[in-house]
């Protein structure tokens, strides 16, 4: 679903890339960053960085990105870091560039806790979700540099897709 929201001829910033799957699916070049990056074979035009966005992202002096994705990432970012996170993205995206974000509905955390309590699932990092509210994204990405292009719920309403476009300054 997120792939459909990306512009063609994309220079992509994949925040939370894990193994670079999105680069393989789209054929895009760019940078993938993830603190839990796994070893992946080199991909032409793609730089993989083990670390956190934005602090560990290498300088990008030559070219802006025309798309960024953060799929199931923002709910793991501490609330006091989100404004800087959005501001950093604005400085890296070209005018008209898109940021595609997916976040779970708060109901998902409750469901995960019940399933973990019943020992039906394990290894879920629900405690890292910081009580994130999807509706907060509209205020985090408020301001003259962003325009909400799309918001929809998917997977029976358990997840949200947001697409913000970078406006010209």
Q: Which stretches of residues belong to each language-model region?
A:
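Class I (Rossmann-like) S-adenosyl-L-methionine-dependent methyltransferase catalytic domain
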Residues: 1-59, 100-169
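A conserved beta-strand element that flanks and buttresses the S-adenosyl-L-methionine
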Residues: 69
């Amino acid at each position: 679903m997120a792939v459909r929201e990306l512009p063609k001829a994309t220079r992509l910033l994949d925040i939370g890339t894990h193994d670079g799957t999105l680069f393989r699916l789209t054929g895009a070049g760019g940078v993938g960053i993830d603190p839990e990056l796994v070893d992946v074979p080199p991909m032409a035009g793609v730089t993989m960085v083990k670390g956190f966005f934005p602090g560990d992202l290498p300088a990008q002096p030559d070219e802006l990105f025309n798309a960024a994705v953060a799929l199931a990432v923002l709910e793991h970012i501490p609330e006091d870091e989100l404004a800087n996170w959005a501001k950093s993205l604005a400085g890296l995206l070209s005018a008209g560039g898109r940021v595609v974000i997916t976040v779970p509905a708060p109901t998902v955390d409750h469901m995960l806790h019940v399933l973990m309590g019943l020992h039906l699932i394990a290894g879920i990092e629900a405690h890292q979700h910081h009580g994130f509210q999807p509706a907060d994204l509209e205020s985090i990405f408020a301001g003259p540099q962003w325009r909400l292009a799309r918001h929809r719920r998917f997977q029976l309403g358990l997840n949200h897709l947001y697409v913000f476009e970078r406006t010209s300054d």
